[in-house]
Amino acid sequence: MRAVDDLGYTPNFGARVMAAKRTFTIGAIIPTMENAVFARGLQAFQEELRERGYTLLVASSAYQPDVEAAQIRALVARGADGLLLIGYERGHEINHLLAAQNIPTLVAWTYSGTNAQPSVGFDNRAAMIALTRKVLDHGHRRIGFISFYVQDNDRARERLVGLKETLQDAGLPDDALRVIETQYEVESGGDAFEKMMRSATPPTAVMCGNDVLAVGALRRAREMGLSVPGDVSITGFDDLELARIVTPALTTVHVPHRKMGREAARELVKMVEKKSLGTSTELDTWIVIRESLDRPPR
């Protein structure tokens, strides 16, 4: 083997492709590369693919359905053996293209027992229900929610649905909740937080659709001279590393990103190699209570 290395030998990839009738390439389209929400899971996805002899091609849709559609077409045209997509929601034209091309496709970052499309992910609605119950258990009755735009984003929409259902089940009136939809950016989270807190009846707890928005809210609270959680509680979603290192540390929903990435890679390779028709796996999430959540001010 050392002699092979010394000679600079490279395995004949073309021959391998022809023999297997595959390119040993997997495409993944994620909504953004600008924050850490997808990084950890995608890293684990790539590691597992590499162990199985596959190369990963990654594209970002910038949360734009038309961009995602163009990238799907490009990856299909380049002969990707399989695709990893984020979330269920996309247009009929793209679903028809994927079916017509017969390309194995797996969805991640979400799970629904009623959706037939193979997925490895978690129940966004159930996760938000669990977090909202914790917030209510602390005595909060005026809630703010900073969300990404729910149109064309089933993950964001399901989190909002879970929040609304929980507040309704608790008997709270409609005006107990204020929702602002915005970009998944730190500054956007801060702007939405300030708008809520300067209203006539500000919330006592601000829940955020992910940790990036929550960090923006924390930073803006400090700039406004507000104590967290003394004046207002703040929660996130994802349990990124930054949720543990900010001050105060964020109460959030832990999402098993690395496990999700590895299991998604295993299932998608099985689908590509025709060892599976595609099965769905639901992963557990759990609430991590940290310093940013406490009882409302008196």
List the predicted regions and their residue ranges.
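Alpha-helical recognition/docking segments in bacterial nutrient-uptake
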Residues: 13, 21-133, 137, 198
